[in-house]
Structure formats: structure tokens, C-alpha cells
Amino acid sequence: YPLLPLSDLFAKAVHRAQHLHLVAAETTKDFERKYIPEEQRHSHKSSPSAFCQSETIPAPTGKEDAQQRSDRELLLYSLLLIQSWLNPIQNLSAFRTSDRVYDKLRDLEEGIFALMKTLEDGGSSQGFAWLKFSYERFDGNLSEEALMKNYGLLACFKKDMHKVETYLKVMNCKRFAESNCTV
């Protein structure tokens, strides 16, 4: 991320977050079609195993909540969510393009650091260091248990990338109040 105007940094970060969310959604859908019987798809989403680790952090849960938070908080939560997936994504064989997804996560992480630095935050995430966590690695086994675990992880990845996308869009809209600003 070379020295770009703040509006361009936000635009790039939002675009990358949207792309990652789309990839996560498509991968989850492909995984469902390939491995998960129709009747299990709906029951799994309400089961306790569908719980995502990110739900344990005090991050905003929706657009309205995100609008009440500072840019610093939203950037830190976005960074935390992205970093929690860096390790597990490397092992995701369901992504035929796991290298590219990992690279895109790293790129978005770098973009968020650039935003933090530009916003005079210095890129420090010290205030949230105690919140660090990482998801389990994806299981390469094709047993039913492993498939359901991977399905849950994919659902969490999709949900977390949607959160990052929402946080970045909210910040972009607050700062630049574009007429076509939708979150």
C-alpha cells in the first residue's frame, strides 16, 4: 500500500473485504453441495457446533452497533478477525485456491495497518492483545465428523469476513458520506 489518499485506502480495503466475503460464501456453498446433505445444512446452522470463536469478542454485531464504534475499534476488530484466520486458511483444502485466499487475507491485513497508520493510530493493536485467538485448522479427513467441523469453520469464515466488510463500509460511509453509501 503506497502512500495513497485515505479515500483510496478505504476503497481498496472495502473492495478486498467484499471479495474475501464473496469467496467465503461461494466456497461454503460449493462445500455444502459437495459434502453436506440438504437436511443437515439447515440443522447444522442452529446447532452448538455452529458457534464461532469470534462471537466471544465484544465486536459489534450489526451495522447499527458498528456505527456507534470508533474507527480505531472497528479497525482493531477487523484486524483481529483477519489474523484469526491466517493460520487455518493455509490448511484449507476445500479452497482450491487456499494460497490466493491466504495472500488476500495478508493483503487486507496490510491495508488495515496502512489505514491505522494514516489515521494516526500508528498501527498498534496493543489495546486488544488479550483478545487474540485463532481458529482450529481445517481437517483433511473426509469422515462425517471432519466434514461437519470444516463446514462449521467455513460458515464462521464467511460470517467473519462479512463482519470485516461491514466494519470497513461503515467507516468509509462515516468518513466520506457518499450518496451511494450502502452497508
UniProtKB/Swiss-Prot annotation:
Alphabetic keyword roster: Disulfide bond, Hormone, Metal-binding, Secreted, Zinc
Entry's Gene Ontology BP terms: animal organ development; growth hormone receptor signaling pathway; positive regulation of growth; positive regulation of receptor signaling pathway via JAK-STAT; response to nutrient levels
Classification via Pfam families: Hormone_1 (PF00103)
Gene Ontology annotations for the cellular component aspect, listed alphabetically: extracellular space
Localization, UniProt: Secreted
Sections of the chain in a coiled coil: none
GO molecular function: growth hormone receptor binding; hormone activity; metal ion binding
Disulfide links within the chain: 52-156, 173-181
Chain intervals with Polar residues compositional bias: 46-56
Binding site for Zn(2+): 19, 165
Presence of keyword RNA-binding: no
Chain segments carrying region Disordered: 38-67
Family assignment from sequence similarity: Belongs to the somatotropin/prolactin family.
Function: Growth hormone plays an important role in growth control and is involved in the regulation of several anabolic processes. Implicated as an osmoregulatory substance important for seawater adaptation.
Protein name according to UniProt: Somatotropin
Source organism (scientific name): Prionace glauca (Blue shark)
